Structure formats: structure tokens, C-alpha cells
Amino acid sequence: VDGAEPDRLRQVLDVEIGAYEAKLKLASKIWESAGGYSPTIGIIGAVMGLIHVMENLADPAKLGSGIAVAFVATIYGVGAANLIFLPIAKKLMANIAILVTQREMLVDGLVGIANGDNPRIVESRLQGYLA
């Protein structure tokens, strides 16, 4: 705070919060991308498994088990996306929102102090973040 103008202080800290948020969202985007690619990789595994089944067309006894094994790759791909990757991405986004809100709360408090606002007013304004 140290004699800085409140508007300038808010501008600088808002830019810092934006950069902080963008950096944190990169990790979430990686998990989200993995959730998008995972089913595709599962389908590729299924196609490769079916190609392998085609090699055994002469033996009908092996067809059923071969097809079942081929589709396991699809189940793994869809399962990994919906049970692992996408929930991790959503959890990260929720945590990022909390961290950004904490920083915004800090900025409001610092700007209130820089403005010379009554401490009770600053406290009540910050309590609004917790409601």
C-alpha cells in the first residue's frame, strides 16, 4: 500500500491475478484435453483389436472373445475420460476459482486500506466474499 494510489494498486494487482489465473488454468486444460483424446484412443484400440480378430476369421470359436477384447479398449478410453481425466479438470477449475476469489478479496482489502476506508466497512465488504 505504501502511499500508492488505490486505482493504480487495483490495476496492477488485477493484472497479476489475471496472469496467475491463466497460469493455473493451463494444468486444467491439459487434463481436459486428455479427457477429450482418451475415448479416441480407446476407439483406435478397438479398431486395432478388430483388425486382429479378422486374422482369425477361419476359427469362429475365437471371434467372440476377440471382439470382446477389442471393445475393452473403448471401455478403458471412455472410462478414463469420464472417471479420471474430466473430473480432475473440473476439480482443478473449482480450486482455481477459490484461489482467484481469495486474491480478489485480498485486492479489495488492500484497496480499502489504501483508500483509508473505515476498517469495519472493509471488514463487511470482505465478509461478502465468504457468504
Predicted regions and their residues:
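Regular secondary-structure segments
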Residues: 1, 14, 48-51, 55, ...
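Short, non-transmembrane cytosolic segments of multipass membrane proteins
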Residues: 1-11, 24-29, 115-116
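Glycine- and small-hydrophobic-enriched helix-loop-helix hairpins
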Residues: 2, 118-122, 129-131
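Short helix-terminus and kink motifs of transmembrane alpha helices
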Residues: 7, 11, 82-90, 120, ...
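N-terminal alpha-helical segment
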Residues: 9, 30, 46, 102-106
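A short structural micro-motif
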Residues: 15-19, 112, 128-131
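Helix-termination/interfacial motifs at the ends of transmembrane alpha-helices
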Residues: 16-95
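Membrane-cytosol interface motif
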Residues: 95-115, 120
